């Protein structure tokens, strides 16, 4: 499928533009909080994960830090999600 296909959602680069089941590209935000890490063991991934929340000038969003990101990212850091995926959590 081509990225120019109108059925493919365009990547979000601001929190206000995030849509479920859509790619996220070049989204910058400041990390507001990081929750305690936990160990995940599955067929797809084994390692530490931590929930976090961040904000830009348009809103606040939850995200998951994976593997080395858990220890590399700190509250107050400005991060860029270069290639991510938006999911709706209920």
Predicted feature residues:
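Terminal helix-to-tail segments of small alpha-helical proteins
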Residues: 2-7, 13-19, 48-51, 55, ...
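Short interface patches used for recognition in eukaryotic signaling and trafficking proteins
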Residues: 11-14, 61-67
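OB-fold (S1/OB) nucleic-acid-binding surfaces
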Residues: 33-63
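OB-fold single-stranded nucleic acid-binding module
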Residues: 35-44, 68-90
């Amino acid at each position: 499928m081509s990225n120019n296909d109108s059925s493919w959602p365009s990547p979000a680069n601001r929190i206000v533009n995030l849509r479920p089941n859509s790619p996220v590209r070049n989204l910058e935000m400041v990390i507001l909080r990081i929750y305690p890490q936990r160990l995940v063991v599955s067929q797809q991934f084994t390692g530490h994960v931590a929930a976090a929340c961040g904000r830009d000038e348009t809103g606040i969003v939850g995200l998951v830090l994976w593997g080395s990101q858990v220890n590399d990212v700190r509250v107050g850091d400005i991060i860029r999600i270069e290639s991510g995926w938006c999911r709706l959590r209920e």
